[in-house]
Amino acid sequence: ADLDELRDFFAFIREADILPQFILYAPEDVIRFNQLVRDGVIPGEKLPVLYVLGRYTTGQVSDPKDLLPYLDASPFVSEWMLCAFGAHENACALTAAGLGGHARIGFENNHLLVDRSGAVDNAALIVQAREGAYLMGRTVATGDQARKIMQPQW
């Protein structure tokens, strides 16, 4: 990748007040992200990231413990979210909630409820995660809260 072009791109989105989405699929991606921030290619002090669990595993299956290598791996992360592939999506989402993160849930990653039955729609997946989050003392973000979570500290 041409780092000068990438630096220019990130300068543009910063100036245009576009919310970037930094998607990290593996702990190695966090190392690369850290280096790009240190080198000034990605501007900012604290940036929101999305950790993806299970995308490149056999059968696209995630496990809550897959999150552990990501935690505290970057001094440049302000808020973090995760999404998780497979039947353990809800367990991963609740693990994130319990550890201070946020979760993104959806049919693009999983179609199964925690009882392994098929979800009739995306809302069913969200409802079960919301109920679990409430039991942990967490709430579901409003649209405005979600935009704030995703706001980089340039």
What label would you give each PLM region?
Residues V114-V140:
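C-terminal helical cap(s) of enzyme catalytic domains, especially alpha/beta-barrels
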Residues G143-W154:
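Short, basic/aromatic-enriched C-terminal tail that caps enzymatic domains
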Residues A1-E108:
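Catalytic alpha/beta core domains of metabolic enzymes, predominantly
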Residues Q60, E108-N110, R116-V120:
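Gly/Pro-rich active-site loop or hairpin
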Residues N34-L36, D115-A119, Q153-W154:
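Short secondary-structure transition/capping segments
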Residues I23, M136-Q145:
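Flexible, glycine/charged-enriched surface loops at secondary-structure junctions
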